Amino acid sequence: MFGNAGGGKSTLARRLAEITGLPLYPLDAIQFRAGGGKVPHEEYLKVHADLLRRDQWVIDGFGCVPSAWERFAAADTLVYIDLPLLTHYWWVTKRLARGQFATPEGWPEKSPMWSSTMGSYRVVWLCHRSLTPRYRQLVAEQASAKRVHHLKSPAETRAFLQAVQEENGLTRHRNPDRPARRPGVDEAPPER
């Protein structure tokens, strides 16, 4: 799961994990401590490498450039959220407003909302300028080797989720015959 800041990656990753039963690992929860402080970079890289050695996962977040490209190479499925630039800015702003009342999805507890949001505005522009062209090239190159989903609108994201539900024998509601799984709870991330 990758794309620019404020594109709904954490929400989509959570829904995918719920539907498929795959374990979810939000990188922000691995890369940052409660309150927003970063873990040492080597510690993050070790935990990230341990995640990639697992058989199945949904990983949400960016991490750092080298770990992102390692993750893309290891994944059997790539989900790229590529929304219009203004949508990313708007959704970052909505996240700031909602974050006044509850921690945003995928964020460490007690993260500083204001400074994190200001950083997200900067990241949206930098990602759009530097990474978006590389991401688009990646999905074009990998389309024949991996399952690639290039989602360019909220409607395409909803259609993708619906297709995943159907593929997993689910409709709008959870299949009662399938045991409920709590990704990230039933399976803990590797030790740091």
Identify the role of each PLM range.
Residues 9:
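Conserved lysine of the Walker
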Residues 2:
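Residues at the beta-strand->loop junction immediately N-terminal to the Walker
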Residues 25-77:
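Conserved nucleotide-sensing/catalytic segment adjacent to the nucleotide-binding pocket
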Residues 19, 123-192:
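NTP-dependent small-molecule kinase module
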Residues 5:
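The conserved Walker
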Residues 12:
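Hydrophobic positions on the alpha1 helix immediately C-terminal to the Walker A/P-loop
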Residues 83-131, 171:
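A glycine- and Lys/Arg-enriched "phosphate-lid" helix/loop adjacent to the NTP-binding pocket
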Residues 19-25:
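Post-Walker A helix-loop "phosphate-sensing" segment adjacent to the P-loop in P-loop NTPases
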